[in-house]
Amino acid sequence: MAENNPLKIHNLRPAPGAKTAKTRVGRGEASKGKTAGRGTKGTKARYQVPERFEGGQMPLHMRLPKLKGFKNPFRTEYQVVNLDKLTALYPEGGEVTVEGLVAKGAVRKNSLVKVLGQGEISVALQVTVDAVSGSAKEKITAAGGTVTELV
């Protein structure tokens, strides 16, 4: 039975008619010769025009405005934590550090952290982070906490 099995690597062939040769145009009158599928006369019959060419109309890349301004390479980006998030993470109060926030999953490690003043706070927190906004500092100290900025 194994000798008659046609499913062997050397017997595999594509189905008849599945593979057809590419039509070579412009090779004689009988087979798409003469104009070779380009129609008669005109620019596109004589040579290839770039796809981006818009027929003399102002091209898209020249119609669009240029970018303005610049990107400051010395900009410092902070991960933001608001006061309402801190009250949810530390309901009994306590010491807030960058490492503690990373451990609780509030921020990613190896980047600066800034506390902003959105929300209210009623417990005393000892906050030690890279930066704190003015409103957050006022609210934390009013609640009996302390603020230490690392940067």
Curated annotation (Swiss-Prot):
One term under GO cellular component: cytosolic large ribosomal subunit
Source domain of life: Bacteria
Keywords: Ribonucleoprotein, Ribosomal protein, RNA-binding, rRNA-binding
Pfam families the record matches: Ribosomal_L27A
GO molecular function, one term: rRNA binding
Region (Disordered): 1-60
Gene Ontology terms: biological process: translation
InterPro entries hit by this protein: Ribosomal_uL15, Ribosomal_uL15/eL18, Ribosomal_uL15/eL18_sf, Ribosomal_uL15_bac-type, Ribosomal_uL15_CS
SUPFAM superfamilies: Ribosomal proteins L15p and L18e
Similarity-based family: Belongs to the universal ribosomal protein uL15 family.
Record note on quaternary structure: Part of the 50S ribosomal subunit.
The protein's role, per its UniProt record: Binds to the 23S rRNA.
Protein name: Large ribosomal subunit protein uL15
Taxonomic placement: Bacteria, Bacillati, Actinomycetota, Actinomycetes, Kitasatosporales
